[in-house]
Regions:
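Charged, amphipathic alpha-helical segments and their flanking helix caps
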Residues: 1-23, 36-138
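Short, glycine-/polar-rich solvent-exposed loops and beta-turns at beta-strand/coil boundaries
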Residues: 25-27
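Short, well-ordered secondary-structure micro-motifs within conserved domains or adaptor modules
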Residues: 29-37
Length: 138
């Protein structure tokens, strides 16, 4: 379930034309984005399976301000519902937080955006059987 969601999230971002990966290997082509799993919980019962997935998207930019990261966040956000529409297991999704930091670890100051997305997934829901009405005896 989580692997399918991450794959579809990756495809969505790649389809928008961004350089995206799921590993922390340094890239020369900016901006580049990295998808991370930030949390996953699953609740299973005899007739319902529900999971909560939190994905983090790191955005690395050489733009001197925050504009490029904000535009990327808005672009992805405007297409986020495509994930829900293309995957019937996605019941709900939203952008939870956005933080933009200065990344000084690579020499010159670069901008590093961290965007957190929450997904509620449900699958294997058993149909509810109707119980016939019973007339009370006199």
């Amino acid at each position: 379930m989580l692997a399918k969601l991450k794959s579809q999230f990756y495809s969505l971002i790649k389809g928008l034309g961004y350089n995206v990966t799921d590993n922390a290997e340094y890239r020369e082509n900016f901006p580049w984005l990295m998808i991370r799993t930030n949390g996953y919980q699953s609740v299973n019962s005899f007739n319902l399976n529900v999971s909560s997935a939190t994905l983090a998207l790191d955005i690395f930019s050489t733009y001197p301000g925050e504009k490029e990261i904000i535009e990327i966040v808005e672009d992805i956000g405007s297409h986020l519902m495509e994930l829900k529409d293309s995957n019937p297991d996605v019941l709900f999704c939203y952008q939870k937080t956005v933080k933009i930091l200065d990344d000084k670890s690579t020499g010159p100051v670069r901008k590093h955006g961290v965007v957190v997305y929450e997904f509620l997934l449900g699958y294997g829901v058993a149909p509810v059987e109707e119980v016939p009405e019973v007339e009370p005896e006199n």
